[in-house]
Design a protein with these regions (language model features):
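Flavin (FAD/FMN)-binding glycine-rich loop and adjacent Rossmann-like elements that form
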Residues: 1-133, 137-153, 203-204, 285
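Short beta-alpha connecting loops at secondary-structure transitions
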Residues: 83-87, 188-191, 216-221
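Amphipathic alpha-helical scaffolding segments comprising HEAT/armadillo-like alpha-solenoid repeats
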Residues: 141-155, 171-185, 203-227, 250-263, ...
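Structural detector for internal amphipathic alpha-helices that build alpha-solenoid repeat scaffolds
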Residues: 159-172, 180-184, 189-203, 223-250, ...
Length: 292
């Protein structure tokens, strides 16, 4: 676990899965979500990461601390969400964006150290010539926000990481579309995914679906902390339902979560304890105090 700057831009898992491009692209990174611990982004409550390698476009703005001049931050300190760092941290990728940062620093000497004032297209052309990034990056703009048609298609699909990322990245426009998808109720898997996305966006329309995931008296198979080589889910389905119910402010879940919590002991998986703790922390209900 490391500390990152807050930059002019922050790269997130949603950007990676959606293939988001930037007008100030300086490199492309590639890896998978080998997270070294547990994930925290809401996307991974809906769909845990898999082992597929992905490309991530790196923005110069992610190297620039917001509100500061004369500073560039590279490597694992750049402005990115904790869960996206596995895709950005490979040695060759860090060397590439650090090379770009060095060129930007030299160019900034002509502007009293102001990196934001440099000739960005000239820097990008040099990076293409050095094969740090492909020529297509010269024509990048910010691909967000996406058109309404893309969100409508994503709300019907709900099967790909890209669809989930697009919907979570555009909450105001996604919520009515997800409510429509949930209301159709034609497919149980898609309905569950819609309910989880809604909850991740703070909407309790599908709370009953999540509550149903907690009906079993016994806990499901949880997850114990793993550092290196951690792929996939770091929470069980029940754990994820508990956290999502907190995110959508469903206090109806309190009794059920407390009943589940009463069955926990030191032999149960770490993820169950974490999920209950997150639920209790969210509501701050004195009724949960004995669990401490």
């Amino acid at each position: 676990e490391r500390r990152q700057i807050i930059g002019d831009r922050e790269i997130s898992p949603l950007d990676v899965y959606a293939g988001r491009t930037w007008p100030d692209t300086i490199a492309v990174s590639r890896s998978n979500f080998d997270t070294h611990g547990y994930t925290i982004h809401p996307l991974f409550l809906v769909a845990p990461p898999d082992r597929e390698s992905l490309d991530a476009w790196v923005s110069l703005g992610a190297l620039l601390p917001r509100g500061m001049n004369g500073v560039l931050v590279t490597g694992l300190g750049l402005s990115g969400h904790r869960d996206v760092m596995p895709v950005l941290r490979m040695q060759a990728c860090v060397q590439n964006h650090s090379f770009a940062a060095a060129l930007a620093a030299v160019a900034a000497l002509r502007h009293d150290g102001d990196v934001r004032a440099i000739d960005l297209p000239a820097l990008q052309r040099r990076l293409v010539a050095a094969e740090i990034m492909p020529p297509e990056a010269l024509h990048h703009g910010d691909s967000f926000p996406v058109p309404d048609a893309d969100l409508r298609a994503a709300a019907v699909d709900l099967a790909s990481y890209r669809s989930l990322a697009l919907l979570l990245a555009h909450p105001d426009r996604s919520l009515p579309l997800l409510r429509q998808t949930f209301a159709l109720g034609a497919d149980s898997d898609r309905n569950r995914t819609a309910a989880m996305l809604l909850a991740a966006l703070g909407d309790d329309t599908g709370a009953d679906v999540l509550l149903d995931m907690l009906r079993a008296d016994q806990w499901d198979e949880g997850w114990n902390y793993r550092g290196m080589g951690q792929f996939g889910a770091s929470m069980s389905p029940q754990d994820r339902a508990i956290v999502l119910l907190a995110m959508c402010e469903s206090e109806r879940a309190t009794d059920r979560v407390l009943a589940k919590a009463a069955r926990l002991d030191a032999d149960h998986a770490f993820s169950h304890h974490r999920a209950v703790a997150m639920f209790c922390e969210h509501f701050g209900d004195p009724e949960t105090a004995p669990l401490g």
